Amino acid sequence: MALFLSHKEPLYRWGVWKMDESVDTLLDLLPEREYYEREVQRFVASHRRLEWLSVRALLFRLLGEHKEVCYQPSGKPYLADYSYFISISHTKGYVSVILSDKVPVGIDIEQYGQRVHRVAHKYMREDESVRLYKEDAT
């Protein structure tokens, strides 16, 4: 099981999943295997299948139950039963999910590199950015 990192707070919970399993292994981690086998066939590209299943495996790991993820026309995800606010992100080899039953949430992960530094001002406060650069220097 490739749960890389998870965290739970009173208002939200989130996790990051390293995508290193096969489609078949991911299907074994999920309840209602037939449902997921059928749904994953919509994707032609193998990396999209792994990404889609990894998000569902992480969601199941965070909640302990099957939840259907739907998408608004804008692409924003939501749960079919509206039990939680949800946000999903992915980058090379990883997916992340954040959930809250109380407040809207958002999450974004990026592969670490120079691009992160170029756009850091868009998503980090100044004190966070200073800390990031100090950590890079050590």
Predicted regions: what they are:
Residues M1-T138:
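Core catalytic alpha/beta fold that binds nucleotide/phospho-ligands
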